[in-house]
C-alpha cells in the first residue's frame, strides 16, 4: 500500500506540474511491474543468490523473459486477484505433465496451484503475486525445455544446462504461446515431431486419460510410467535427427530393424543382437556398401578367446569349419605346423578367415557402415535363432532375418534394381561381389524398452539393464 501511495502520489504531482510547463513525462511503471523488477534485481546479492532466494532454477531465462516484456506480469491480475486465465491454462498443463513422461512435482505444481487460497491469509499480496508469477514462469520455461531436449544429457546423464540459444528459444516459445489464442497447443509445439515420439506420447496420454487415477507417477501404473518416461526422454535426445526421407532404425531391445520412409515403416526385420557381455552399441552411421558371398575375417577377440582353445585341442578345427590361417604377410599357414601349446592370447600372431558359402558366419550378405566398434549388419546360417523370443546372441553385430529384401531396397533407391539377379548369382556361385551405394542409407541403432504400435504400448525386456542407470538420474529426488 505504501508503494502504491508513493507511486500514485508521484503521478499526481507530476500531472500538476505538466499543467503549467514542459513536455509530457512517461508514466511510472505499474506497481506489479516494479515489484517484478525489484525482485529480479541482482545487484545486491548477485545472480545466483538472487535466483536461489526466489526459488528459481532457470533464473537467467526468467530474467530474460521479463526484461523483454519490460517486467509486465504474464500470469497475474494487476488488482492482486490471483491467477489470470492464461495462468490457469498453464497450471492445468503442468498438472498433466505425466502424459509427457514428466512429474508435476518437478515444476512445483502443488505450490503454484495453492495461490488462490494463500491470498486470503496474506496482506502483502503484491509481493506474494510477484513470487508466484516468477515461479510459474520458471516452471514453464523448464517444462518447455524438458519437453524439447529432455531433462538429462544423453552421455553424462547429468541435468542439462541450457546454452544461450536454447534459453532464447525457450523464452521465445513461451512468449509466442502467450500471444496465441490456444496457449496449450502453442506451448506443446516445442515437442519432438518424430514418428516414434509422437506415437508413444499419444498412446501413453490415451492410457492415462482412460485411467485418471494413474496421472500421478507415484500411484497407479508407476512401473509403466517410469518405463514410458525413460523412453520419451531417449526419444527427445534424438531431436536433431530428421524423420523425413529413408533410414534404417534398429531397436536393440525389440530385436527389430525397420526401414522407414517419410515416417512410415516399409520393411520390418527380426534381428539378433549382441549378448549382454558383448552388447550392440547405439550409434548413427550410413550403410554405404554391401558385399555378397563374403569371407569372414575373424575378430582378434574371438580368435584368441574362443578359437585358440579349440586349436590347442585340435588344429583340424579350422578345416572342419571352413577357416584358414594367415600370417602377418597374408600368406597361408598350415595349422598343423604350429605349436599351439606355446601360443597365448598375448602372442597370437595370426589372422583367421572363413571361406564364403552357406557355412560362413556372415551368411550370404554383409552390410557395412562406418563405426568405431567394427560392427555391421549381416546374414547368418543360424536361421533358427529368429524363431526365438530372446535374441541377444551375437558378439555385437546385427544378424538380419531377410537380407535379400534389405539389399533389394538399397539397390532400388539407388536406381540399381537391374543388379538384383546378379546378387542371387553371386550367392549361388560363392563369387564375391561388392555393391557401392552413392547416397547410402542412414542407420540409427537405438535402445528403446517400450514403443507404441497401433496406439498400443509394447514393453520389452531391458536386456542390457540400461534403464536402471537412466532411471537413477531421471528420478533422482
Residue ranges and their predicted role:
Residues 1-27:
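Bacterial Sec-dependent N-terminal signal peptides
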Residues 19-67, 141-142, 158-477:
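Well-ordered beta-sheet/strand-loop patches within structured domains
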Residues 21-160:
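Cationic-aromatic interfacial patches
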Amino acid at each position: 500500500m505504501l508503494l502504491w501511495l508513493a507511486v500514485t502520489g508521484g503521478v499526481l504531482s507530476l500531472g500538476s506540474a505538466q499543467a503549467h510547463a514542459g513536455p509530457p513525462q512517461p508514466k511510472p511503471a505499474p506497481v506489479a511491474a516494479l515489484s517484478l523488477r525489484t525482485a529480479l534485481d541482482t545487484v545486491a546479492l548477485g545472480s545466483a543468490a538472487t535466483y536461489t532466494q526466489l526459488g528459481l532454477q532457470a533464473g537467467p531465462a526468467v530474467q530474460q523473459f521479463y526484461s523483454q516484456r519490460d517486467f509486465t506480469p504474464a500470469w497475474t491480475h494487476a488488482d492482486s486477484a490471483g491467477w489470470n486465465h492464461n495462468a490457469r491454462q498453464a497450471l492445468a498443463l503442468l498438472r498433466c505433465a505425466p502424459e509427457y513422461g514428466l512429474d508435476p512435482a518437478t515444476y512445483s505444481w502443488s505450490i503454484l496451484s495453492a495461490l488462490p487460497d494463500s491470498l486470503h491469509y496474506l496482506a502483502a499480496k503484491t509481493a506474494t503475486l510477484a513470487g508466484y508469477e516468477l515461479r510459474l514462469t520458471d516452471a514453464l520455461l523448464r517444462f518447455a525445455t524438458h519437453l524439447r531436449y529432455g531433462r538429462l544429457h544423453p552421455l553424462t546423464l547429468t541435468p542439462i544446462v541450457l546454452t544461450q540459444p536454447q534459453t532464447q528459444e525457450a523464452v521465445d516459445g513461451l512468449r509466442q504461446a502467450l500471444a496465441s489464442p490456444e496457449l496449450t497447443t502453442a506451448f506443446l509445439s516445442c515437442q519432438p515431431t518424430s514418428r516414434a515420439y509422437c506415437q508413444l506420447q499419444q498412446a501413453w496420454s490415451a492410457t492415462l486419460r482412460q485411467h485418471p487415477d494413474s496421472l500421478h507417477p507415484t500411484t497407479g501404473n508407476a512401473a509403466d510410467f517410469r518405463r514410458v518416461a525413460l523412453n520419451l526422454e531417449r526419444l527427445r535426445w534424438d531431436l536433431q535427427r530428421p524423420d523425413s526421407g529413408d533410414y534404417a532404425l534398429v531397436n536393440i531391445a525389440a530385436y527389430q530393424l525397420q526401414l522407414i520412409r517419410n515416417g512410415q515403416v516399409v520393411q520390418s526385420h527380426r534381428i539378433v543382437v549382441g549378448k549382454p557381455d558383448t552388447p550392440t552399441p547405439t550409434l548413427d552411421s550410413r550403410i554405404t556398401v554391401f558385399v555378397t558371398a563374403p569371407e569372414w575375417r575373424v575378430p582378434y577377440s574371438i580368435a584368441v578367446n574362443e578359437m585358440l582353445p579349440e586349436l590347442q585341442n585340435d588344429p583340424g578345427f579350422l578345416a572342419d569349419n571352413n577357416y584358414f590361417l594367415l600370417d602377418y604377410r597374408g600368406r597361408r599357414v598350415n595349422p598343423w605346423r604350429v605349436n599351439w601349446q606355446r601360443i597365448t592370447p598375448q602372442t597370437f600372431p595370426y589372422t583367421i578367415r572363413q571361406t564364403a558359402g552357406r557355412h560362413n558366419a556372415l551368411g550370404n550378405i554383409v552390410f557395412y557402415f562406418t563405426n568405431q566398434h567394427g560392427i555391421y549388419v549381416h546374414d547368418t546360417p543360424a536361421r533358427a535363432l529368429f524363431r526365438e523370443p530372446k535374441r541377444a546372441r551375437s558378439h555385437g553385430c546385427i544378424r538380419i532375418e531377410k537380407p535379400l529384401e534389405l539389399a533389394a531396397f538399397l539397390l532400388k533407391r539407388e536406381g540399381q534394381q537391374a543388379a538384383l539377379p546378379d546378387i542371387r548369382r553371386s550367392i549361388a556361385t560363392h563369387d564375391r561381389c561388392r555393391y557401392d551405394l552413392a547416397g547410402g542409407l542412414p542407420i540409427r541403432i537405438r535402445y528403446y524398452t517400450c514403443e507404441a504400435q497401433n496406439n498400443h504400448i509394447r514393453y520389452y525386456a531391458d536386456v542390457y539393464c540400461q534403464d536402471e542407470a537412466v532411471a537413477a538420474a531421471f528420478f533422482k529426488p
